[in-house]
Every structure is written in structure tokens, then in C-alpha cells.
Regions:
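N-terminal subdomain of nucleotide-sugar transferases
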Residues: 1-46, 214, 358, 373
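Membrane-proximal helix-turn-helix segments that form the acceptor-binding/catalytic region
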Residues: 13, 72-73, 79, 93, ...
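Carbohydrate-associated surface elements
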Residues: 28, 151, 172
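Nucleotide-sugar donor phosphate/pyrophosphate-binding loop at the beta->alpha transition
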Residues: 63-66, 104-107, 115-138, 175
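Conserved donor-binding/catalytic core segment of Leloir-type glycosyltransferases
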Residues: 184-212, 224
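Nucleotide-activated donor-binding/catalytic signature segment of Leloir-type glycosyltransferases, i.e.
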Residues: 189, 233-260
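Nucleotide-sugar-dependent
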Residues: 202, 254-261, 268-290, 297-307
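A charged, aromatic-enriched C-terminal amphipathic alpha-helix characteristic of glycosyltransferases
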Residues: 319-323, 336-368
């Protein structure tokens, strides 16, 4: 499951806890996906197939349309009182138009700012203008907009959202799934782990580029990636150069398995490419790692770095190969020296108290329901 899937499941559960009947309209998972969870009481899931890229992602205009067009017809003939849409803004626009035709309220869950995302990828000016127009229209029309941080809220208001309609509900992780309690992987040697999406704006290949310097100090160390994304080709190329399976791409794994790898790691790796419009981001993988007790190495600046630094979740460093490799070496040194149990417990306790996804989901559901009453 992606961070977005966890977030939406928490929202759906929040609605169920408030006595709502919830229907989730989503995609049929790709064949490579791990088995999904069974349906829960009060929550019905409807799936239909979509076009995907070679990596199994719903990524690109044609792929989005393969979801959005059938969605429009499903919403036109479905019985509902309220719709909640998540990004991309193309999906938000479909929900906005159908809801207007049917005179139903809708909410928009803005975990990311897509206009900034397409700018960071170097998209043509026309694409940026179209994305900005769609995102702004959706934000203006939504009865409620859910934001994950104050920084995202400010950016949403700049794009046209009414501040009094934006609820900053925070972000978090499933602390039942991601916790220090449970089995931990043993790789026979120290390893560092990156879990989740490897997009252009995360720059996950930076850690692979740092591995040669790490191996000079710790020749038996290994770097493991779990997930998928645009950085995979660059990571595979670096893995081939390093050789000896020192850098391993493990694909998409179930969340429970990801938690096992995190628990056993010398450190969990998180990154945001600075200066491309995503410095406000606080990746969910930071919370997941800290919830398992693992120290976080965050490469980048802005809100994500402050989160790690201010709450003792690990180490925030510059987005450079030298800074990252030094931090990775320090993490392995600490792992070899043993101990650190108090720090692991403190990290997990902070997430439990401040970033439980159950609490986020309930707060989000309450904000949406309050907006339509």
C-alpha cells in the first residue's frame, strides 16, 4: 500500500466510526501487487481496471483518463450524499463537475500540490497552466479541503482555496502496523533501507550514489530499496556499477514486510530534492521509520528536515552525496556498537503520540462532515 492508500483507508475508517456508510471507488491492483486487505464492516470497495505504465503505476495523462472517464459514469448513477476525491486534479475535476450536476457536496484531499509537482518535473508550460487551472478550480469549488501540513495549507490558499474551508489534519502512519514490536529482518550484515515511492522530486538515487563511499568503510554493508518509481533506472544503473548485490531493489512488498525491514535496519532513508517546490513535504516514510524505532536519515531541507531534527527522529543532512554517505557511515557505526534502545523507544513513542493515522483519519472525517452540515 502507498502512503495515499493508508491515508484514505484511515479517512474511510473515520467516516465509519461516525456512522457513515462508505464506498471506496478505486483501481484493480496490478499483478505484481501484494495481496490486499479484506473489506471491513461498513466499508465497501469497488474496483475497476486502468491503464498502467511498465512499472505498474497509474502515471500519465492517458492512465489518469482511464480511471477518470469510467469514474464519471459511476458517479452519475451512484447513490451518495458526499464524495471525497484525492489527487490528481483530473480526478478532482471529474468529481467536482459530477457533484455540481447532481447538487452534491464534495471534499478534496490535498496531500500534495500537483502544480508544483509538474513544475518540478520540467513539464511544458501548457501542461503547467492546465494543471494549475484544474487544481485551482477544484480547490475553489470544494466544500472542504483536507491538508496535511501548515505549509501545504498556505500553498493551497495561494492556488485559490478558501482558508476557512481548509482543514489541516496532519499526516501520520498506521502505528498498529508500524511499531517497534514485531519481527525484524536479519540480513547477516548492516543494511540501510528505503521504502516507498521513488519519484523525481524525492531523488532516491542519491543514496545509491553514496554507497561506494559507504563501502570503503563498511564493505559488507547493503542498501535495500522497496517500492517503485521514476528513479528505478538510475538506481539499477548504480547497483550494476557497484556490483556484488550491495544495492538491491526488492520491488513492492506488503506493509508488514516493509516494517520488518525497517526494524532491522541501521537507518531508514528519506529524501526530498531541495529547491523544486517540495520543501514543504513531510514524507510518510519518515513517520513509518520512526514508528518502528529506526533512526531516519533525511536528505534535503525545509519542513521534512525540521521534522527529523526537531523531534529527535534521526539526522537531517544536505542533499549531497558526501553528506549522505557520511550519515550512512555514522548510522552503521552506531548499529555495530549496539544499544540505542532508549532512542528507538523515544522515536516510536513520539509517533504514537503525534502522528497516529487513526487520529488523523478521524480528524479528517470530522472536518469534512462539519463542513457539509
Amino acid at each position: 500500500m502507498s502512503a495515499g492508500a493508508f491515508r484514505l483507508r484511515a479517512l474511510a475508517r473515520g467516516f465509519v466510526r461516525r456512522g457513515c456508510r462508505v464506498r471506496v471507488v478505486t483501481t484493480t491492483p496490478p499483478p505484481s501487487a501484494p495481496p490486499g486487505a479484506v473489506e471491513e464492516p461498513g466499508l465497501r470497495v469497488s474496483r475497476f481496471p486502468v491503464l498502467r505504465d511498465r512499472g505498474g503505476n497509474v502515471r500519465g495523462y492517458v492512465q489518469y483518463l482511464s480511471f477518470d472517464i469510467p469514474l464519471a459514469f459511476r458517479l452519475l448513477f451512484a447513490r451518495y450524499d458526499l464524495a471525497v476525491a484525492e489527487a490528481p486534479p483530473t480526478t478532482g475535476m471529474v468529481v467536482s463537475v459530477v457533484s455540481a450536476l447532481r447538487r452534491k457536496p464534495f471534499a478534496y484531499y490535498a496531500a500534495d500540490v500537483w502544480t508544483d509537482g509538474v513544475i518540478s518535473m520540467g513539464a511544458p508550460g501548457l501542461v503547467v497552466r492546465l494543471m494549475r487551472a484544474m487544481e485551482s478550480a477544484v480547490l475553489r469549488r470544494a466544500a472542504s479541503v483536507l491538508s496535511i501540513s501548515d505549509e501545504v495549507t498556505d500553498r493551497l490558499v495561494e492556488l485559490g482555496a478558501r482558508r476557512d474551508r481548509v482543514a489541516t489534519v496532519g499526516n501520520g502512519v498506521d502505528t498498529g502496523m508500524f511499531s517497534p514490536d514485531g519481527p525484524a529482518k536479519d540480513d547477516g550484515a548492516p543494511y540501510l533501507v528505503y521504502t516507498g515511492t521513488m519519484s523525481e522530486w524525492q531523488g532516491a538515487e542519491l543514496f545509491a550514489s553514496a554507497m561506494p563511499a559507504v563501502l570503503e568503510r563498511h564493505p559488507d554493508a547493503r542498501l535495500r530499496y522497496f517500492g517503485q518509481g521514476a528513479s528505478e533506472p538510475a538506481i539499477r544503473a548504480e547497483a550494476a556499477r557497484v556490483g556484488d548485490r550491495r544495492i538491491v531493489l526488492g520491488g513492492v512488498v506488503p506493509p508488514a514486510e516493509a516494517a520488518e525491514w525497517i526494524r532491522g535496519a541501521a537507518a531508514a532513508l528519506v529524501s526530498i530534492v531541495p529547491g523544486i517546490g517540495y520543501d514543504f513535504a513531510r514524507p510518510t516514510k519518515t513517520y513509518a521509520a520512526a514508528a518502528c524505532g529506526a533512526p531516519v536519515i533525511f536528505a534535503g531541507t525545509g519542513s521534512g528536515a525540521a521534522l527529523v531534527r526537531d523531534h529527535g527522529l534521526g539526522e537531517a543532512v544536505d542533499f549531497t552525496t558526501a553528506a549522505v554517505s557520511d550519515a550512512m557511515v555514522r548510522a552503521i557505526d552506531a548499529w555495530r556498537s549496539g544499544g540505542g534502545e532508549e532512542e528507538r523507544a523515544a522515536r516510536a513513542a513520539w509517533v504514537q503520540a503525534n502522528a497516529s493515522l487513526d487520529a488523523v483519519g478521524t480528524n479528517a472525517a470530522d472536518a469534512v462532515l462539519a463542513a457539509i452540515r
